[in-house]
Amino acid sequence: MAVPGPTARAGARPRLDLQLVQRFVRIQKVFFPSWSSQNVLMFMTLLCVTLLEQLVIYQVGLIPSQYYGVLGNKDLDGFKALTLLAVTLIVLNSTLKSFDQFTCNLLYVSWRKDLTEHLHHLYFRARVYYTLNVLRDDIDNPDQRISQDVERFCRQLSSVTSKLIISPFTLTYYTYQCFQSTGWLGPVSIFGYFIVGTMVNKTLMGPIVTKLVQQEKLEGDFRFKHMQIRVNAEPAAFYRAGLVEHMRTDRRLQRLLQTQRELMSRELWLYIGINTFDYLGSILSYVVIAIPIFSGVYGDLSPTELSTLVSKNAFVCIYLISCFTQLIDLSTTLSDVAGYTHRIGELQEALLDMSRKSQDCEALGESEWDLDKTPGCPTTEPSDTAFLLDRVSILAPSSDKPLIKDLSLKICEGQSLLITGNTGTGKTSLLRVLGGLWEGMKGSVQMLADFGPHGVLFLPQKPFFTDGTLREQVIYPLKEIYPDSGSADDERIVRFLELAGLSSLVARTGGLDQQVDWNWYDVLSPGEMQRLSFARLFYLQPKYAVLDEATSALTEEAESELYRIGQQLGMTFISVGHRPSLEKFHSWVLRLHGGGSWELTRIKLE
C-alpha cells in the first residue's frame, strides 16, 4: 500500500463503561501531572474553601432552630445576638461561595490550557495532523474536538468539581448527625433512596451519552460545511451554486436538528427522574423525622423544645438528602462530561498511537531542520544527492491500482528533474513519497539532504499562507518573529518580493510588520499567491526546491523569470509541470504513463 488507507468508521458505541473510566483517568493525568503542579494546588485550595463553606452552611442551617428557641422564650437580647451571628455567617458564606466559584473558573481555564496544549503537542508532532485529516476517517472533526469539545468538557467538569469533591465529607458528617437524630432508620432509608435513584439515572443516562457523541459529530459536520462555503465562496459564486449549497447545508442542519430532538426526548426521561427524586426527597426527610416523634421518643419535650428539635433534625436530614439529590441532579451534566470524555479520549488515543509510531522516524520528521534559525550556514555537511529511490512502487490510497512501479532514481545537485504525465498518473503522489507523507508499497526512499534552508523545500500545489504579517508569510515556516521596528533582514525580504513581482504588496499591507485582519486567500489572486510562494522560496534559498505545478497560474514569461532567479540562487529543481517551456530549466524528465509505467530521459537543449 502506498499509504494507510482510511480506516472504517466502525467504533463501539460510547457507553458508561470501563472504557469511559480509562479515558477519563487518562485525561486527569494531563490535568494533574504531579503533586507539585499548579492544578493540584488550586484543587487543594478549592477543597479547603468548600470545607470551610460547609462548616459555615452547617452553622447557618442551625439558625432557624435557634430562632424557634429565642422567639418561643421571647428572649430579645438572644434574638439580637442571634441575628448578628446570622448576618455574619451569611456574609462569610457568600464570600466563601464566591471564592468557590472563582477557583472553579480558574481550574476551567488551567484545565483547558493544559489539555489543549497536550493535544496540540501530539497533533502537530511530525505529520500526525496530516495523517489524521487526510489518511484516516475514523476520527471525525479533530479540529472541533480540540477547540470546542475540550472547552465544553472543561467548563462542565469545573462546574461540578466543588460539589463532587466535598460530597464524601458532607455525606459522612451528615450521615453521622442523622444517625444521632433518628437512629439507623434515617441513614438506611436515605441511602436506599439514593441507590435506587442512581440505578434509575444510570439507565436513563446511557442512551444520552451515545446520542450526545452523535450530536457533536453532526455539529462539526455542519460547521465544516459553512467553512467550506467560506473558503470556496468565489468558485461557488462562479458556479451560481447558492441554491444547491443552500439545499446541502440545510440537509446537514436537518440531520443535526433531528439528532438534537432525539437527544432532548431521551433527556426528558432523565429530567423526570431527577425532578421526581428531588421532590420525593423533601417528603422523605419529614417521614424519617416523624417516625421517632410518633413512636414517643420525644414525648417529654415541650412544644417549643420539640419545634427546635424538629427544625434541627429536619435540617440535618434534608441536607443529607440534598447532598444525594445534588449528585442525582448532576446526571445531566455528567452525561455531557461522559460524552465529551469519549470524544476527547478517542482523539487522544489516536494521537498517542500515531505519535508513538512517528517516534521511530523522528529523525526524518519535523525535527529535520531548525525552525528558529534564519537562513545561514548549514549545520551539517552538504550532500550532493537529495533523493535516492531504489525500485519504489506506489499505490493509490485504498486501491490496488499501481501508480508507479519499480522506480529507481537518483536526484543530484545541479541535475534538475521535471516530472510530467497525464492527470492521475501519480505525479503529486511521487512528491508525497519523497516528502515522507506517504509510504511506498515496496522499495526504499532515502532523503539525503535536510529540510529547510540549504536543504530541501517543498512548494505544494496549493499555496499555503498562515495568519500573520507579510514578513511572517515570507519567512514561513521559520518561527523567529522580528520586532515592529524592523530588522536587518528587511532589505532582503523587500528585494525578494520585488524579484517575485510583488513590489506593490508591501504598500498594500502597510509594511512588513503591519498586522492585517484579512484572509490572505481572499486578497491575493492565484498568480499573486504563487509569486508570494516563490518570494518565500528565494528567502529560504534551499539547495533543492520541490515544486508541484507551482507556476500554473502564471504566464510562461513570469514562470521563466522565477525559475531563472531560482537557478541564479543555486537551486536544483524537482518540478511537476506540463509546459514544454519548463524543460530548459531541467536536466532530466520523468514521464509517468499510468498503470505503473514510466520513462526517464535526459533533456537535450538546443
From Swiss-Prot:
Superkingdom field: Eukaryota
Gene Ontology biological process: cellular response to leukemia inhibitory factor; cobalamin metabolic process; cobalamin transport
Domain (ABC transporter) ranges: 389-603
Database matches in InterPro entries: AAA+_ATPase, ABC1_TM_dom, ABC1_TM_sf, ABC_transporter-like_ATP-bd, ABC_transporter-like_CS, ABC_transporter_sub-D, P-loop_NTPase
CDD domains referenced in this protein's UniProt entry, alphabetically: ABCD_peroxisomal_ALDP
Enzymatic class: translocase
Membrane topology: Multi-pass membrane protein
Subcellular location: Endoplasmic reticulum membrane; Lysosome membrane
Keywords in alphabetical order: ATP-binding, Endoplasmic reticulum, Lysosome, Membrane, Nucleotide-binding, Translocase, Transmembrane, Transmembrane helix, Transport
Subcellular location, principal: endoplasmic reticulum
Domain ABC transmembrane type-1, chain residue ranges per copy: 39-332
Enzyme Commission numbers on file: 7.6.2.8
Residues that, per the record, bind ATP: 421-428
TM annotation in the entry: 43-63, 76-96, 190-210, 279-299, 314-334
Family stated for the protein in its record: Belongs to the ABC transporter superfamily. ABCD family. Peroxisomal fatty acyl CoA transporter (TC 3.A.1.203) subfamily.
Subunit structure: Homodimer or heterodimer. Interacts with LMBRD1; this interaction induces the translocation of ABCD4 from the ER to the lysosome membrane. Interacts with LMBRD1 and MMACHC; this interaction ensures the transport of cobalamin from the lysosome to the cytosol.
Name under which the protein is recorded: Lysosomal cobalamin transporter ABCD4
